Amino acid sequence: TTVEAMATEENCGLPKASQKQTIVVDYSSPNIAKEMHVGHLRSTIIGDALANCLELRGHDVIRQNHVGDWGTQFGMLLEHLGDNTDASISDLVAFYKEAKQRFDSDGDFKERARERVVSLQKGDSTTLEAWRKLCDVSRVEFDAIYDRLSVQGLEEKGESFYNDRLANVVQELEKTGVAETSDGALVVFDEKDK
């Protein structure tokens, strides 16, 4: 069969690339404190297959995993953790559901969660320490799945990676007129939306 023939050939029958390139392959990009699901598995398996083929052809491959580790949901999670210091976060999915239920039903909690996001974005040390704890627990879960799938060599860049870079981007968008204020928020409209 074709598969058997490929297995006996050098590089499984894939020709070496005429020009070596550096290629970035995006993987599953799961969200901290949430379960990985079928959509994450699909992109992980396809991404890994592509990365392996590209490496066999001689390319340098960056296996990028852009993790959802920043944003509004962390205010909710961190505030829930602060209110329940003895709570177990080993089951982050259950912990997330509890926090979300409180966020949806308790106005005071919702306001404190929003304030906690601001503390996180400003780099409050206590908030950052709790945030790292949540991220670390999730990474253990993610790594167990990647190990089971024999996925190796992922380079993680979370959304948090860009936090200290955003101020300059926002200033540039404002200065050039690309961003504008609408309903109290700084936004960038697509030309067709104007």
Where are these regions (language model features)?
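NTP-dependent nucleotidyl-transfer catalytic core
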Residues: 1-194
